[in-house]
Protein backbone atom coordinates (compact mmCIF):
# COMPACT_ATOMS: atom_id res chain seq x y z
CA UNK A 1 0.00 0.00 0.00
CA UNK A 2 1.39 3.46 -0.87
CA UNK A 3 2.61 5.82 1.84
CA UNK A 4 -0.06 8.38 0.91
CA UNK A 5 -3.61 7.30 0.09
CA UNK A 6 -6.28 9.47 -1.44
CA UNK A 7 -9.83 9.20 -2.71
CA UNK A 8 -11.40 11.57 -5.23
CA UNK A 9 -15.08 12.56 -5.21
CA UNK A 10 -16.61 14.54 -8.06
CA UNK A 11 -18.23 14.44 -11.45
CA UNK A 12 -17.74 17.55 -13.61
CA UNK A 13 -15.28 18.44 -16.40
CA UNK A 14 -12.84 19.94 -13.90
CA UNK A 15 -13.03 16.69 -11.90
CA UNK A 16 -11.93 14.73 -14.98
CA UNK A 17 -8.83 16.90 -15.40
CA UNK A 18 -7.90 16.54 -11.73
CA UNK A 19 -8.44 12.77 -11.68
CA UNK A 20 -6.25 12.46 -14.79
CA UNK A 21 -3.51 14.46 -13.07
CA UNK A 22 -3.77 12.35 -9.90
CA UNK A 23 -3.56 9.13 -11.93
CA UNK A 24 -0.55 10.44 -13.87
CA UNK A 25 1.20 11.53 -10.66
CA UNK A 26 1.14 7.98 -9.26
CA UNK A 27 0.64 9.46 -5.79
CA UNK A 28 -1.66 6.92 -4.17
CA UNK A 29 -5.10 7.52 -5.68
CA UNK A 30 -7.01 4.55 -4.31
CA UNK A 31 -10.51 5.21 -5.62
CA UNK A 32 -12.71 7.58 -7.57
CA UNK A 33 -16.31 8.19 -6.49
CA UNK A 34 -18.58 9.81 -9.06
CA UNK A 35 -22.29 10.60 -8.80
CA UNK A 36 -24.44 8.33 -10.93
CA UNK A 37 -25.97 9.96 -14.02
CA UNK A 38 -29.30 10.05 -12.17
CA UNK A 39 -27.78 11.71 -9.10
CA UNK A 40 -26.07 14.30 -11.30
CA UNK A 41 -29.07 15.10 -13.49
CA UNK A 42 -28.91 18.77 -12.43
CA UNK A 43 -25.30 19.17 -13.67
CA UNK A 44 -25.08 20.08 -17.34
CA UNK A 45 -21.31 19.63 -17.15
CA UNK A 46 -21.52 16.12 -15.63
CA UNK A 47 -18.71 13.79 -16.64
CA UNK A 48 -18.60 10.12 -15.80
CA UNK A 49 -15.09 9.70 -14.41
CA UNK A 50 -14.56 6.00 -15.14
CA UNK A 51 -12.53 6.65 -18.34
CA UNK A 52 -10.17 8.90 -16.35
CA UNK A 53 -9.73 6.69 -13.28
CA UNK A 54 -6.95 4.52 -14.70
CA UNK A 55 -6.28 1.54 -12.43
CA UNK A 56 -7.99 3.21 -9.46
CA UNK A 57 -11.15 1.64 -8.11
CA UNK A 58 -14.30 3.30 -9.45
CA UNK A 59 -17.67 3.72 -7.73
CA UNK A 60 -20.86 5.60 -8.54
CA UNK A 61 -23.12 6.90 -5.78
CA UNK A 62 -26.55 8.42 -5.29
CA UNK A 63 -25.79 10.20 -2.00
CA UNK A 64 -22.20 10.91 -0.97
CA UNK A 65 -23.26 11.01 2.70
CA UNK A 66 -25.13 7.68 2.67
CA UNK A 67 -23.66 5.31 5.27
CA UNK A 68 -22.83 2.70 2.62
CA UNK A 69 -20.94 5.24 0.51
CA UNK A 70 -19.02 6.58 3.50
CA UNK A 71 -18.14 2.99 4.51
CA UNK A 72 -16.81 2.27 1.00
CA UNK A 73 -14.65 5.40 1.13
CA UNK A 74 -13.40 4.44 4.61
CA UNK A 75 -12.31 1.00 3.33
CA UNK A 76 -9.57 2.73 1.33
CA UNK A 77 -8.16 4.29 4.53
CA UNK A 78 -7.54 7.63 2.80
CA UNK A 79 -5.26 10.29 4.16
CA UNK A 80 -7.08 12.86 2.01
CA UNK A 81 -10.41 12.98 0.22
CA UNK A 82 -10.38 15.44 -2.70
CA UNK A 83 -13.81 16.89 -3.52
CA UNK A 84 -14.44 18.84 -6.74
CA UNK A 85 -17.81 19.17 -8.43
CA UNK A 86 -20.14 17.80 -5.76
CA UNK A 87 -23.48 19.48 -5.14
CA UNK A 88 -23.98 17.94 -1.70
CA UNK A 89 -22.53 19.30 1.52
CA UNK A 90 -20.28 16.70 3.12
CA UNK A 91 -21.47 15.65 6.56
CA UNK A 92 -19.40 14.88 9.64
CA UNK A 93 -19.04 11.08 9.14
CA UNK A 94 -17.44 11.62 5.74
CA UNK A 95 -15.40 14.61 6.90
CA UNK A 96 -13.99 12.48 9.73
CA UNK A 97 -13.00 9.60 7.42
CA UNK A 98 -9.60 10.73 6.08
CA UNK A 99 -6.69 10.92 8.51
CA UNK A 100 -5.54 14.34 7.26
CA UNK A 101 -8.80 15.81 5.96
CA UNK A 102 -10.92 16.71 2.98
CA UNK A 103 -9.73 19.17 0.36
CA UNK A 104 -12.40 20.72 -1.81
CA UNK A 105 -12.73 23.48 -4.30
CA UNK A 106 -15.32 25.52 -6.18
CA UNK A 107 -14.60 27.73 -9.18
CA UNK A 108 -16.27 30.75 -7.60
CA UNK A 109 -16.16 32.87 -4.49
CA UNK A 110 -18.37 31.29 -1.84
CA UNK A 111 -20.95 31.57 -0.50
CA UNK A 112 -22.22 34.29 -2.85
CA UNK A 113 -21.55 32.39 -6.08
CA UNK A 114 -22.46 28.86 -5.10
CA UNK A 115 -24.09 26.51 -7.55
CA UNK A 116 -23.51 25.24 -11.05
CA UNK A 117 -21.82 27.18 -13.84
CA UNK A 118 -20.48 29.99 -11.64
CA UNK A 119 -18.24 31.45 -14.34
CA UNK A 120 -21.19 31.88 -16.69
CA UNK A 121 -23.21 33.49 -13.89
CA UNK A 122 -20.33 35.81 -13.00
CA UNK A 123 -20.26 37.06 -16.59
CA UNK A 124 -24.06 37.24 -16.87
CA UNK A 125 -24.27 39.21 -13.61
CA UNK A 126 -21.49 41.58 -14.64
CA UNK A 127 -19.25 40.74 -11.68
CA UNK A 128 -15.94 42.56 -11.70
CA UNK A 129 -14.34 39.99 -9.39
CA UNK A 130 -14.26 36.23 -9.61
CA UNK A 131 -12.14 33.61 -7.90
CA UNK A 132 -11.75 30.11 -6.56
CA UNK A 133 -12.72 28.91 -3.10
Tell where the protein language model's regions lie, with residue ranges.
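One-carbon transfer enzymes
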Residues: 1-133
Amino acid sequence: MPDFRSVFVGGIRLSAAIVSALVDSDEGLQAVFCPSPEAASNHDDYVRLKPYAGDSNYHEYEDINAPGTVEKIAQYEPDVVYVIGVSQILKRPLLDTPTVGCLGGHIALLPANRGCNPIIWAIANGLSQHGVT
